[in-house]
Amino acid sequence: MLTWLHTDVTAKTLVVYYSYTGNCREIVTTLTSQMEADVLEIQPAEKGLKYEANNYALGTQLLNAIKANPNDAGSYPAIDPVATSLNDYETIIIVTPLWWSLMAANMQTYLFNYGSQMAGKNVGLIVSSASSGISGVVDDCKRLVPEGKYFSENLWINHSNHSNRATLIQEWLTAIDYNTVTGISETKTTATAPTRIYDLGGRLMAEEPSKGIYIKNGKKVIR
């Protein structure tokens, strides 16, 4: 017996990330090996900056400017223009470094500019840090994306467990019930070949699988 479920391919996931040291980029690579998603990398407009130089002087300066006037667009560092429309996505996963107990300034810029467009969307947060806890980053995210539908748990990956990120990500996706929240769930049929494909509304879509996301024998299949 075949078990198939067809979902609306427009209900997609976007992973938005900023990476300074490369750790968040590695996290995103691992994450997207376990799920289907588009990826958007946030880049600072001014290249080659050393945020950690002179005892983290520049990074601290950027964060202090945001803290002083968090509602002023001029407080946030410039980032490269972003062409990706959030209208195409139902789920946004934010992957960001922690800077001095707060969200990295460049990611704060992106969320200041686009966080209001995430209202009503599923929002997940993955934070990379050396060792510090992530409560300040969570607070920044909820300030900048106040109307997001946050998953039940955030994921913290630090220096000591970064090498184990594949397992941590897999456990997190299970804990937040990602497949169910995003419309991927199992359904069974006793129908014989040819296999009929139905959408979530019960409408017949095709006699054979076409492009989309399916569940085959309890496993997600991308065609």
How does the language model describe each region?
Residues 6-94, 103, 170, 174:
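N-terminal beta1-alpha1-beta2 submodule of the flavodoxin-like/Rossmannoid cofactor-binding fold
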Residues 20-23, 44-48, 98-102, 129-133, ...:
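Solvent-exposed loop/turn segments at secondary-structure junctions
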Residues 33, 86-87, 112-120, 132, ...:
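Short, conserved loop/helix-junction motifs that constitute active-site signature segments
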Residues 121, 210-213:
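A glycine-anchored, Pro-Gly-centered beta-turn/N-cap motif
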Residues 124-157:
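Short, glycine-/small-residue-rich phosphate/pyrophosphate-handling segment
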Residues 150-181:
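Glycine-rich phosphate/pyrophosphate-binding loop and the adjoining helix
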Residues 179-201:
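Residue-level detector of functionally pivotal "anchor" positions at catalytic/ligand-binding pockets or at interdomain
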Residues 213-223:
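C-terminal tail/sorting-segment detector
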